[in-house]
Amino acid sequence: YSNDEIAIGGDSAGGNLSLVTFLKLRELNEALPAAMICISPWADPAATGESYNEEMADKDPLIGPLFKKIWSKFNMKSAIGYYVKKEDVDQSNPFICPINGDFSGCPPVMIQVGADELLLSDSRSMINVFERDGVIHEYKEWENLWHVFQLDGEMEESTKSFEMFR
């Protein structure tokens, strides 16, 4: 396939990897995909956004309990140490925290996120980055839904979500 027939995408940490893949391809002057789809992208592993709080964790049945455990049991602000080695943590590095990247020249991107999920601010921050950098994008925030709700294939919203990818 040629690059204009390829879209990349991922959910959660896979959304992070999709965003970082674009940055790396552009840095290497490689062909870019035609489009990107990010479902609840973990674009701020440093957890600097406003949605990283107890209230949102209580609403998010998928990752809320994990983050609450990280916050209380391990006294950590974020889970970034599970993503990169402690000595490599640099939240200003866009290859770790895409919210700090320059997305000029990025192909069109679709982001979908649950309005009741812990990573909500990650998606909102990425939309701000895309608007700043002139990236064509589509954004859908699903009311009363949690992180990667699309995994529940029985929900009507999951079906509608996947129909939007066409």
Regions found by a protein language model. Give the residues of each.
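Alpha/beta-hydrolase superfamily serine-hydrolase fold, recognizing
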Residues: 1-166
